[in-house]
Swiss-Prot record:
Belongs to the universal ribosomal protein uL16 family. InterPro entries: Ribosomal_uL16, Ribosomal_uL16_bact-type, Ribosomal_uL16_CS, Ribosomal_uL16_dom, Ribosomal_uL16_sf. GO terms for molecular function: rRNA binding; structural constituent of ribosome; tRNA binding. Part of the 50S ribosomal subunit. PANTHER family: 50S/60S RIBOSOMAL PROTEIN L16, LARGE RIBOSOMAL SUBUNIT PROTEIN UL16M. Binds 23S rRNA and is also seen to make contacts with the A and possibly P site tRNAs. It comes from the Bacteria. Keywords: Ribonucleoprotein, Ribosomal protein, RNA-binding, rRNA-binding, tRNA-binding. It comes from Pseudarthrobacter chlorophenolicus (strain ATCC 700700 / DSM 12829 / CIP 107037 / JCM 12360 / KCTC 9906 / NCIMB 13794 / A6) (Arthrobacter chlorophenolicus). Residues 1-25 are annotated as: Disordered. This is Large ribosomal subunit protein uL16. The lineage of its organism: Bacteria, Bacillati, Actinomycetota, Actinomycetes, Micrococcales.
Amino acid sequence: MLIPRRVKHRKQHHPGRSGAATGGTEVSFGEWGIQALSPAYVTNRQIESARIAMTRHIKRGGKVWINIYPDRPLTKKPAETRMGSGKGSPEWWVANVKPGRVLFELSGVNEEVAREALRLAIHKLPLKARIVRREGGE
């Protein structure tokens, strides 16, 4: 699981999800990628689940890059607790994903295997996404 080792502040404000991604919008490491089309919080478990789905399909060939990191804590108060008495405890870690952001990249496999592996990974994520190919000279 991806979790920060240390953080300066244990609890943070909720990050905004509006607007488009300003960086990380192009495939830069691999040949294929997953690009987000809608905003979402992606948890560390969802990232790991998508990674496992991809690596199982490509078997020993290819290389996978994860371009997002869950660096924001989301808090939750216990069930049946009265309002007030402070903010809840950190429950899970999320990556704030905006539209246009490339989440995963993949290379070293043929087109058919790459598309199927990325399709399996997209089904594990809580957002709309598309498969993109690297532009220009490889």
